[in-house]
A protein has these predicted regions:
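Membrane-embedded transmembrane alpha-helical bundles that form the catalytic cores
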Residues: 1, 6-276
Length: 277
């Protein structure tokens, strides 16, 4: 059997055996699948399209709507999630009607407590593909083994064991950036995520020591909420690079988010896409 990677197949490859198994139409599958399809279309055609009106207006005219930069990226979060997860809802719903079960591709990503956790919940099939065909091959390669040995000699055993994983994550998210598109903004988007994950890995022991010092177990409700909000902010910063036309525009809009804030400008955005530039 050919096990070469395919960017386009994703979860379908692992589930293709279901295509050759006998299935029969069942009322509960039809009902469940139809409900999932309707929910998907609602997210794509209502929520995503509604959010896109504000996203396009703000990102296409950042100086005209300078006080709305932060709203632009928040609406983009709604647009992305509703569009991507809505599409998967339709696919999963159709498959369900035929008795084929597909894995969920989004699992409450905005309740993540870290960037690593976010990527375990967001676009899961992409993350699985990257893990199987990029992360593991890189981590288990001979040159990475040599790099790990060098790291242990220079930085000690603990850091030396972590360095190969950090480097592998950087490579993975470089590929994630290129996967999104052949432009610098996508590479910066990918590396932004990779650097945060790599840095978190290097700092993991320090984080544990700090939590112990301040008597934080990690189970406190306030701490959990703090981690969710922190991660949500970090994720939204990355969206600036994903949606802006250039890296420069992304940084410009980040600056506007801090220096200017005028929610009243939302009233100036035309109600339809035809009114946006």
């Amino acid at each position: 059997r050919d096990r070469s990677p395919s960017r386009g197949l994703g979860d379908v490859y692992k589930r293709q055996h279901q295509l050759y198994e006998p299935h029969k139409f069942e009322g509960k599958n039809i009902t469940r699948g139809f409900e999932r399809i309707l929910w998907g279309f609602f997210k794509k055609m209502i929520l995503a399209d509604w959010a896109a009106v504000f996203v396009d207006a703000i990102f296409d005219n950042p100086d005209q709507y300078s006080g709305l930069a932060i709203f632009g990226v928040l609406f983009y979060t709604v647009q992305l999630y509703a569009d991507f997860s809505g599409g998967m809802d339709v696919v999963i719903g159709i498959a369900s009607m035929f008795g084929i079960e597909l894995d969920e591709n989004f699992k409450r990503p905005f309740f993540s407590i870290s960037i690593t956790d976010f990527w375990h919940r967001w676009h899961i099939t992409l993350g699985t593909w990257m893990k199987d065909y990029v992360f593991y091959p890189v981590t288990l390669s001979k040159w990475m083994g040599k790099f790990g040995k060098w790291g242990k000699k220079v930085f000690g055993k603990k850091t030396g064991r972590t360095l190969p994983i950090c480097l592998a994550n950087l490579i993975v998210f470089f590929v994630v950036g290129v996967w999104h598109g052949a432009a610098w903004k996508y590479i910066v988007y990918g590396m932004y995520n990779g650097i945060i994950i790599a840095f978190s890995g290097l700092m993991a022991e320090h984080y544990r020591n700090w939590k112990k010092k301040f008597n934080i177990t990690g189970k406190e409700n306030w701490y959990h909420v703090f981690m969710i909000i922190r991660t949500f902010i970090l994720v939204n910063i990355s969206w600036f690079f994903d949606r802006a036309d250039t890296v420069g525009q992304a940084f410009h809009m980040m600056k506007l988010s801090v220096t200017k804030f005028a929610p009243s400008q939302l009233l100036l955005i035309p109600a339809g896409k035809e009114g946006t530039a």
